Amino acid sequence: MLLGKRQRPPIKRTTSLSEIKFDLNQPSEQEPSDHQIQLVNVDEHRQVHQRLLDQRLLAMVSPRGTQRRHSSDYSEDFLRSCSLCKRLLVHGRDIYMYRGDRAFCSLECRQQQITVDERKEKKKGSVRSTIVVATGTTTGERVSAAV
């Protein structure tokens, strides 16, 4: 036994085909001859035929009905058109995403939106970095300091 290894219980074996015994010496059931076939009246034949048709029809119909749909059937609103140029996005073509909720038809549209957003952030950042501090002087001078 190796160090650090623990013994496992023996694997329980299942019945294999070699363990199943078939008695081939028994006579098999003979197929009915033409004389043994019973004639079925017309009404019984219609009932049997109708049951077979019903089973075939039910086999084709999904038990869940037509309510089942795939997630690809539903596309989010932002995946329908380009966020910049509003062009319809074609199914099966590449969609370029930006910030998780914006879809674009091309790399160019995506890059234009990125530059627009960067400009907006720079403008907001420059406004936030300037803080106006009022001094205690009577002249009302203001001092701004960059943070």
Swiss-Prot record:
One of its GO terms (cellular component) is nucleus. Induction: Down-regulated in response to mild as well as prolonged energy depletion. Up-regulated by glucose, sucrose and mannose. The keyword Electron transport does not apply. Disulfide bonds: none annotated. Keywords: Cytoplasm, Metal-binding, Nucleus, Zinc, Zinc-finger. Interacts with KIN10 and KIN11 via its FLZ-type zinc finger domain. Interacts with KINB3 via its N-terminal part. Interacts with DELLA proteins GAI and RGA. This is FCS-Like Zinc finger 5. The lineage of its organism: Eukaryota, Viridiplantae, Streptophyta, Embryophyta, Tracheophyta.
